[in-house]
From Swiss-Prot:
GO terms for cellular component: plasma membrane. Putative multisubunit membrane-bound [NiFe]-hydrogenase eha is composed of at least 20 subunits. Its main location: membrane. It comes from Methanopyrus kandleri (strain AV19 / DSM 6324 / JCM 9639 / NBRC 100938). Keywords: Cell membrane, Membrane, Transmembrane, Transmembrane helix. This is Probable [NiFe]-hydrogenase-type-3 Eha complex membrane subunit A.
Length: 97
């Protein structure tokens, strides 16, 4: 049987990727080389933030749901995609210099 927490993390990552695309984030970073790019995209860091936030909700907080964990993962994924899309408004980039 599949671990419901792992399924929730996968659902969160998939929903976060889709929501980020719907919010207008590019699918991958445009800057090259991509490994040195800090541009936010749907591929990175959006699913990573969603997976981490889902694990925090399930494991660290100890959420024992009346709601299935896959739905919790979907909600956390959508919220983390919205956070990632507007992260530079919350935490502005520092001035170069």
């Amino acid at each position: 049987m599949k671990d419901p927490g792992l399924v929730a993390v996968g659902v969160a990552a998939a929903v976060a990727f889709g929501t980020a695309l719907a919010l207008g984030l590019p699918p991958i970073q445009r800057d090259k080389p991509r490994r040195k790019s800090w541009e936010v995209s749907a591929a990175f860091p959006t699913p990573v933030i969603a997976a981490g936030a889902t694990v925090l909700v399930i494991r660290v907080i100890g959420y024992h749901p009346p709601i299935p964990l896959a739905i919790v993962g979907a909600v956390v994924g959508a919220l983390s995609a919205a956070f990632t899309a507007y992260i530079e408004k919350v935490f502005p980039r520092p001035e170069a210099g």
